């Protein structure tokens, strides 16, 4: 790997919660079929994710279709068992305007991925980082990938968090945009939330928590349908997503993740109402 030069960019790392249970409780053919659908969806050549990202991006500002599709092609996806890695790199002399476009596309793609996977009964926990790293084919090295891995695995719920460094860089670029719709979208996409972290306690009141920037999966205008329909039992809705594909949801650790995810969604719903983005 001596000929590989470090690259600056963005990394998103996502783990599928309950993946082992999913494999254990389904036939090989069923598991392969479901995973194949996931792979097709997160591929940047897939019509679903491309069209959704393009629709959101075009709605936020007057983007050229050719430029948007070029940015989508430049973003890379890698899948290792229960882990999905999303990568976007910057050129050495990348212009701020180009960086801004890549950040916005990246965040929207992450939103689409997380929402699709939750709706498909394969909730994710993930983290978005930025910095210098090495990657070639399927080999990764560098602080951002380690940071994303450790942060994602520390989450005790289904959520996608963003490091302070990643948030500050994206916020500086995007909030300097001349497009008010872009700034409004960005400031609705990310909120600060007390994220519950893994510990050995079964008592949710005693869990370690950390205030982290968190992707808002309930931004209604980002997709035509919200994850949570109005007047639904929120806990039951989240529980059903965790139970899909014959997954067992009986262990205290899993039920705690369900409860923590429900609390996050309650916060996101309140945020939407307060900020009139419903």
Question: Whereabouts are the PLM-identified features?
Answer:
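A short acidic (Asp/Glu
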Residues: 22-24, 89, 136-143, 171-174
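Catalytic-core segments of nucleotide cyclases and related cyclic-nucleotide turnover enzymes
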Residues: 99-104, 114, 135-152
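Catalytic NTP-binding/metal-coordinating core of nucleotidyl cyclase/transferase enzymes
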Residues: 2-112, 119
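Catalytic/regulatory signature loops of cyclic-dinucleotide turnover enzymes
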Residues: 115-126, 130, 145-166
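A short glycine-enriched loop-to-beta-strand structural element that forms part of the catalytic core
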Residues: 79-86, 122-134
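Short, solvent-exposed loop/turn segments at secondary-structure junctions
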Residues: 19, 133, 167
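Intrinsically disordered, glycine/charged-rich C-terminal tails and inter-domain linkers
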Residues: 157-160, 164-278
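Catalytic strand-loop-helix junctions within cyclic-nucleotide turnover domains
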Residues: 89-99, 127-139
């Amino acid at each position: 790997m001596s000929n590989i030069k470090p690259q600056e960019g963005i990394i998103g790392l996502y783990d599928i919660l309950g993946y082992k249970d999913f494999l254990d409780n389904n036939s090989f053919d069923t598991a392969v079929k479901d995973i194949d659908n996931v792979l097709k969806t997160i591929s940047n050549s897939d019509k679903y994710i491309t069209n959704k990202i393009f629709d959101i991006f075009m709605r936020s500002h007057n983007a050229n279709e050719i430029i948007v599709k070029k940015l989508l092609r430049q973003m890379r996806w890698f899948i290792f068992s229960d882990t999905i890695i999303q990568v976007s790199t910057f050129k050495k002399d990348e212009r701020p305007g180009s960086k801004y476009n890549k950040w916005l596309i990246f965040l929207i793609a992450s939103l689409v991925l997380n929402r699709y996977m939750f709706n498909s009964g394969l909730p994710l926990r993930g983290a978005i980082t930025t910095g210098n790293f090495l990657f070639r084919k399927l080999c990764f090295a560098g602080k951002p990938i380690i940071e994303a891995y450790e942060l994602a695995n520390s989450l005790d719920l289904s959520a996608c968090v963003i490091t302070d460094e990643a948030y500050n860089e994206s916020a500086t670029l995007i909030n300097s945009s001349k497009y008010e719709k872009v700034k409004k979208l960005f400031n609705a996409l990310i909120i600060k939330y007390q994220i519950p972290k893994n510990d050995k306690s079964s008592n949710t009141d005693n869990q370690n928590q950390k205030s982290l920037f968190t992707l808002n999966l309930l931004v209604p205008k980002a997709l035509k349908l919200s994850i949570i329909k109005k007047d639904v039992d929120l806990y039951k809705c989240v529980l059903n997503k965790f139970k899909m594909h014959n997954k067992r949801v009986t262990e205290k650790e899993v039920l705690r993740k369900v409860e923590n995810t429900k609390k996050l969604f309650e916060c996101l719903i309140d945020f939407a109402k307060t900020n009139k983005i419903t």
